[in-house]
């Protein structure tokens, strides 16, 4: 039986495990908003390892995502509509190894393995750095280089729609601030052409970065993802979501996303989608 047959047969299991969070050491349980200017009070129950915040463009999805990230990491910045609010009245309950803990902007220590990830921004930084330093001086002196394993290559090919003979990753450090970033070299099947990150289209480059990030993320992490649909066609979005479900299940991740794409939302249950809207002068959030 091929890897593709096995993976496709188990996709329903991955999504079920995302929904029921069986054997997860970390479970985000609830989000509470009380007495916060500009916001209606809300008590939101979170029942899935994958939660998406949706709403129209410009409504503040990113601000809310960054605020939740900031409360858990204690790195609160660029929170937009919340910047002048009393954010200490926003609390998040998480079960960690069977024990419930409450986090606010001032309560609880910053958690390990909490990351905010925006593939589009990372892709832009990488391309800008390539344009600034086309010879890539010092990039590969201490970089970690490897080829993606077949089990990951299956998903890469399905998501990008390309048949790669191999995907080589160089994890580059010490070039862009404290950011570790991937530099790719790929070869397509039945082709003599080898090309690298700077020769890729925006969609292909962003997808490879997003896939790399999920492979690179440690087990039992909490990952915040900013609009994964940007520059990506609907079919790739759907296949990316299947890979995300596979990764959440195998690594026991908690993932929160901001999105306005129906293709990103469609495989998720209604109880895993939070709707951000504006009612009069106040914002509302509901599921």
Locate predicted features:
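Extended helical coiled-coil dimerization/tether regions that scaffold
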Residues: 2-17, 125-202
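Pre-Walker A-like glycine/lysine-rich segment at the N-terminus of P-loop NTPase domains
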Residues: 15-65
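Phosphate-binding glycine-rich loops of NTP-binding sites
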Residues: 47-81, 206-213
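Nucleotide-state sensing region of NTPase/ATPase domains
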Residues: 75-162
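GG-anchored amphipathic helix commonly corresponding to the ABC/SMC/Rad50 NBD signature/C-loop
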Residues: 200-225, 234, 238
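Conserved hydrophobic alpha-helix in the ABC-type ATPase nucleotide-binding domain
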Residues: 239-244
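H-loop/switch region of ABC-family ATPase nucleotide-binding domains
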Residues: 258-260
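RecA-like P-loop NTPase motor core
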Residues: 265-287
């Amino acid at each position: 039986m091929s890897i593709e047959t096995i993976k496709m047969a188990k996709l329903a299991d991955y999504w079920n495990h995302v929904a029921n969070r069986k054997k997860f050491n970390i479970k985000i349980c609830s989000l509470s908003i009380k007495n916060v200017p500009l916001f209606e009070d809300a008590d939101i129950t979170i029942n899935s390892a994958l939660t998406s915040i949706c709403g129209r463009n410009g409504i503040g999805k990113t601000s809310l995502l960054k605020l939740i990230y900031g409360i858990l990491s204690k790195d609160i910045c660029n929170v937009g509509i919340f910047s002048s609010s009393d954010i200490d009245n926003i609390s998040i309950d998480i079960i960690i190894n069977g024990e419930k803990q409450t986090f606010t902007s001032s309560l609880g220590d910053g958690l390990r393995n909490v990351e905010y990830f925006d593939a589009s921004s990372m892709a832009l930084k990488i391309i800008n750095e390539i344009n600034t330093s086309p010879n890539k001086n010092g990039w590969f002196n201490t970089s970690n280089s490897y080829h993606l394993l077949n089990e990951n290559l299956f998903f890469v090919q399905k998501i990008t729609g390309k048949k790669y003979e191999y995907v080589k990753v160089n994890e580059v450090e010490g070039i862009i601030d404290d950011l570790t970033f991937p530099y790719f070299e790929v070869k397509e099947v039945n082709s003599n052409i080898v090309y690298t990150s700077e020769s890729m289209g925006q969609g292909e480059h962003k997808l490879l970065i997003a896939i790399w990030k999920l492979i690179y993320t440690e087990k039992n992490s909490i990952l915040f993802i900013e609009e994964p649909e940007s520059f990506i066609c609907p079919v790739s979005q759907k296949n990316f979501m299947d890979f995300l479900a596979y990764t959440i299940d195998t690594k026991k991740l908690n993932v929160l996303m901001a999105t306005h794409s129906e293709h990103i939302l469609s495989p998720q249950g209604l109880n895993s989608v939070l709707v951000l809207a504006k009612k009069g002068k106040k914002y509302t959030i509901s599921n």
